[in-house]
Amino acid sequence: MKNKITIGIVGGGVAGLVFANFLKDSSRFKIKIFEKKEFTNKPATGIQISNNARRILNKINFNQIDTGQFSEVHKVNIFQYENKNKIAELNINYFNNDKEEYVSLDRNLLITFLLSELKKKIEVYHEEVISIQNNTIHCSNKLDEKFDVIIVADGIFSRFANKAWENSLKKINALAYRGVIRGYDSGTTKNVDLFLGNNRHFVFYPINKSGDFSFTSIFASNSNSLSSDYSSASSSEELLGISSNANDEIKKIISSASNVYKWPIYHRPTINFGQDQVFIIGDASHAMPPFHAQGAAQAIEDSFCLAQMFEKNILNISHFKSIRTSRVEMISSKSYRNLFIYHLSNSFLKKVRNILIKIICKYPLISKFYFGKIYNYKFKN
């Protein structure tokens, strides 16, 4: 009997778990996941899964989740930050097909689903990985194990490419606050609300059908401090203090939050998919600004594409680069552009922006052309 290909996955987040799920039933692979933290429920955090990622997740039974636990997004309402005057609305139903709708949910639900779908077919070790050398994973408990292939999926603060890569993490001139509010009556659980202001914007969306919502408030910031953790505790009072020119709806949302967290926003200017037999995926490979809600979606795409390659016995990083680089670069570029567009403060430029947004959203052909490149994606190896 031919020996199985051994795969070590560093990181038990979205990217690593999706990849493992696609290969869990294959008799050709033996997989272990290394995740230093226990899988316990963290504070609720909103996550958006656009159509391109939903299509992939359905292949591992996401469409069997109780639909009450997430919310289908039908449109994006775009408002002025200061007065809630409506600029336009984007009809997401242009891209929604049955069971392939754009959805928003609590990230904990997604992780729990991915873990349950593994059905204990893949071993998960709660050990901290210290280093990767010569295809060997070295853990803090002195455990060393060699693999044929290693998948690095340990997120934005990844340390396992090389020193130059570790130091390539850059901070964007923006600071984000986020929180979740429970039992909020917004009148709908099917919309994303986006508010555009001077050097700031605010995003609000449901994470289930029970009245729970996630918000993110992003401000231009020149702070150069880098936190060793992704987020730190804040408060609704602190956020209200820097949101004095927000409309009443935004202030009401912030006031309703019991827990608020803030974090600087990072990115990696270059993409690194790995070398030799060490593949890098998701935020570890191409951390991008979160201004197109594509971080999780691109991690899911990476995982699916790589798993499809492995199923066809293509264990080649050059091939992976050839099918992923241009798409990731395109979406990352759009995300950077959105930050500039959302935060315009010049009155004339804002008027031009609003006119263009109205045109894009009003005409289906233009909407489908502009957003279809992202949401209609279907990978063919």
Spans of features found by a protein language model:
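C-terminal helical "tail/cap" subdomain of flavin- and related membrane-associated enzymes
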Residues: M1-K4, G8, K252, H292-A293, ...
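Conserved Rossmann-like nucleotide-cofactor binding loop
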Residues: A15, F39, F157
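Conserved Walker B
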Residues: K37, I156, S285
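Conserved mid-domain beta->alpha element of the FAD-binding
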Residues: I9-K24, I151-V152, Y177, F204, ...
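Conserved N-terminal helical subregion
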Residues: K2-I7, K24, S50-V180, N224-E237, ...
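Residues at the starts of beta-strands that form the adenosine-phosphate
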Residues: T6, F29-K32, D212
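Glycine-rich FAD pyrophosphate-binding loop
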Residues: K24-A44
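Conserved FAD/dinucleotide-binding core of flavoprotein oxidoreductases
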Residues: K86-I111, R182-Y261
